[in-house]
């Protein structure tokens, strides 16, 4: 089974993501960007779902570090900020896709399937 890291500090958003992933993927949770970087370094994930606004280390910084160390690992941005500048910052950090919150379940599944073969 493919393994996904969900980097999300908000409990409600994490519960929604577990609903999407349960049964199809193994998944772990990181509650901040620093934890996400550490977990990616220790485990073999196939994809990261990255909240961009988190404590300790934001998702953009965490994504840039992850992509530097693991360039082939797809990182998908999750954020309530949907302005063009936010999307561009996510791309610049290394995100391969951008999902706006609240996340639509079908869009999320399609995006995951696109990057996990």
Placement of each model-derived feature along the sequence:
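Conserved phosphotransfer cores of two-component systems
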Residues: 25, 41-43, 65-73, 93
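Acidic, metal-coordinating helix/loop segments flanking the phosphotransfer/catalytic sites
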Residues: 29-47, 68, 88
